[in-house]
């Protein structure tokens, strides 16, 4: 599921403080 994948990426990026992923 693409939405779940996006949420996972956002979650990981948020915890590591690295915002390499955005809409």
Swiss-Prot record:
Tissues expressing the protein: Expressed by the venom gland.
Keywords: Calcium, Disulfide bond, Hydrolase, Lipid degradation, Lipid metabolism, Metal-binding, Secreted, Toxin
Protein name: Acidic phospholipase A2 Ts-A2
Posttranslational mods: Contains 7 disulfide bonds.
Cofactors required: Ca(2+)
Enzyme type, top EC level: hydrolase
EC numbers on record: 3.1.1.4
GO cellular component, one term: extracellular region
Biological-process GO terms, alphabetical: lipid catabolic process
Domain of life: Eukaryota
Species per Swiss-Prot/TrEMBL record: Trimeresurus stejnegeri (Chinese green tree viper)
Similarity annotation: Belongs to the phospholipase A2 family. Group II subfamily.
Main location: secreted
Coiled coil residues, start to end: none
Cofactor descriptive note: Binds 1 Ca(2+) ion.
Known function: Exhibits moderate hydrolytic activities and prefers the anionic micelles (dPPC with deoxycholate) to the zwitterionic micelles (dPPC with Triton X-100). PLA2 catalyzes the calcium-dependent hydrolysis of the 2-acyl groups in 3-sn-phosphoglycerides.
Recorded GO MF terms: metal ion binding; phospholipase A2 activity; toxin activity
Catalytic reaction annotation: a 1,2-diacyl-sn-glycero-3-phosphocholine + H2O = a 1-acyl-sn-glycero-3-phosphocholine + a fatty acid + H(+)
Compartments, as annotated in UniProt: Secreted
């Amino acid at each position: 599921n693409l939405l779940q994948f996006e949420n996972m990426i956002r979650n990981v990026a948020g915890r590591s403080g690295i915002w390499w992923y955005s809409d």
